[in-house]
Amino acid sequence: MENLEKKIELLKKIREFLILNLEIKKLMQELNVDSDIYEAYEKVTKIVREPNIKLYRQYYDAIKEMFYEEYGKKRKDISWYPKIDYNRCKNCEKCISFCPRGVYDAENGKVVVKYPYSCIVNCNACSIMCCENNAIIFPDEKIPRRN
């Protein structure tokens, strides 16, 4: 049980990192921070994020089978994950570098949703970081929690 609790705590910390990272990037854009500084920040966050992406990939199959008490379903039975509108996608790969869960990857020169069930249920933060064409699409409604 202790190992599961550690994994849950790690997931919570990664979610906090995701939100903080999004806020920092938005602030840097609003302040017109020099592109060299922004690129350096991107490199640092990638280094910090990389071990967690590997962890999620190792446990991907287990994640699909995890029971989400708050939704009353296994993850594989919850239809919440991104889709890419390739008519809008510029292959800028911002989603790949942004997502701490490693949902996206590049294959044959285009961005793909490689690990859809690694996506945090009801999270759509990557669609905010996406290029201005809104190429990342999520379900219209959030998944309701059980009472």
Swiss-Prot record:
Iron-sulfur found in the keyword field: yes
Residues holding [4Fe-4S] cluster 1: C89, C92, C95, C99
One Pfam family this sequence matches: Fer4
Gene3D superfamilies with a match to the protein in the record: 3.30.70.20
Domain of life: Archaea
Assigned keywords, A-Z: 4Fe-4S, Electron transport, Iron, Iron-sulfur, Metal-binding, Repeat, Transport
PROSITE patterns: 4FE4S_FER_1, 4FE4S_FER_2
InterPro entries per UniProt: 4Fe4S_Fe-S-bd, 4Fe4S_Fe_S_CS, Fe-S_Ferredoxin
Binding residues annotated for [4Fe-4S] cluster 2, in chain numbering: C119, C123, C126, C130
Residue ranges of every copy of the 4Fe-4S ferredoxin-type domain listed in the record: 80-109, 110-141
Cofactor binding annotation: Binds 2 [4Fe-4S] clusters.
GO MF annotations, alphabetized: 4 iron, 4 sulfur cluster binding; metal ion binding; oxidoreductase activity
Cofactor names: [4Fe-4S] cluster
The protein's name in its UniProt record: Uncharacterized ferredoxin MJ0251
